[in-house]
Amino acid sequence: MEFILSLIGSLLLIICVLVSVAFLTLLERKVLGYIQIRKGPNKVGLMGIPQPFCDAIKLFTKEQTYPLLSNYLSYYISPIFSLFLSLFVWMCMPFFVKLYSFNLGGLFFLCCTSLGVYTVMVAGWSSNSNYALLGGLRAVAQTISYEVSLALILLSFVFLIGSYNMVYFFYYQIYVWFLIILFPMALVWLTISLAETNRTPFDFAEGESELVSGFNVEYSSGGFALIFMAEYASILFMSMLFCVIFLGCDVFNLLFYVKLTFISFIFIWARGTLPRFRYDKLMYLAWKCFLSFSLNYLLFFIGFKILLFSLL
């Protein structure tokens, strides 16, 4: 019975995430429209609300082609695996429904994000296109560079709260949010989240002027839709993780989802306003600035815990 309840909870979660992804794309198009002083999609149905569902139907009913001399199996499997990982990583979040409660939620998140690199790399390589391969290589180098700082910041919090379980963030933020105490850390985490999800200003994987569309250049119809959905699901997840770590983790509160929407809006806002970074500056930022920053914070938290234990 417990297994059936977990299965139903997982299915509900997946459906809710996919519907959220649909409306996040609509929000992005609306916000970008207003940033560029025009209307977003507003013709389909009431104020353009069914637009993302129409786009999904259009994409999945188009002809699925595959490039000549491409690696057929890995070419098709990588978008599916990419979406699967983006949905699977949601399991580590503390939810009210009967889901798997992980004591090692933070570690599970790191494993899933590390595996996400391979899907991009395989998608780029198996397309048999120079543009796709270069885009894939860029995305892999970028993700690996920023994952180091991401893991170190998460490890700092693990030392602070003494557990990998996400629920502990709620206990430690009852009186004051970590955002207020550790504001520089929150800014760095948000920047790393932008880089991890390959979003503006770090969208080198799909630099139009250089790589046409990056690692997904050869994908059409369903394959492209799956990659697109995986990207937006990871944006939502990163927004939720930011709210859990820095904004109180009160997941049973309606205000939590208002905060989640605001952080997702920041991702879109960055896309509408910021220009693309230079690639060497991106790598400089990752290895010279963020790595030293996260290592310093890690040492600070370890020292803080040692001091605390010595006083006790």
Swiss-Prot record:
The record's Gene Ontology cellular component field reads: mitochondrial inner membrane
**What InterPro entries does the annotation carry?**
NADH_UbQ_OxRdtase_su1/FPO (IPR001694), NADH_UbQ_OxRdtase_su1_CS (IPR018086)
Query: What is the predominant subcellular site recorded for this chain?
Result: mitochondrion
Q: What is its EC number?
A: 7.1.1.2
Q: Give the membrane topology.
A: Multi-pass membrane protein
Give any single GO term for biological process.
aerobic respiration
Record's keyword annotation contains Methyltransferase: no
List UniProt keywords, sorted A-Z: Electron transport, Membrane, Mitochondrion, Mitochondrion inner membrane, NAD, Respiratory chain, Translocase, Transmembrane, Transmembrane helix, Transport, Ubiquinone
Cellular compartment(s): Mitochondrion inner membrane
| Molecular function in Gene Ontology | NADH dehydrogenase (ubiquinone) activity
Q: Which reaction does it catalyse?
A: a ubiquinone + NADH + 5 H(+)(in) = a ubiquinol + NAD(+) + 4 H(+)(out)
Q: Give the family this protein belongs to, as stated in its UniProt record.
A: Belongs to the complex I subunit 1 family.
Q: What does this protein do?
A: Core subunit of the mitochondrial membrane respiratory chain NADH dehydrogenase (Complex I) that is believed to belong to the minimal assembly required for catalysis. Complex I functions in the transfer of electrons from NADH to the respiratory chain. The immediate electron acceptor for the enzyme is believed to be ubiquinone.
Q: What is this protein called?
A: NADH-ubiquinone oxidoreductase chain 1
Recorded source organism is Drosophila subobscura
Gene that this sequence comes from:
mt:ND1
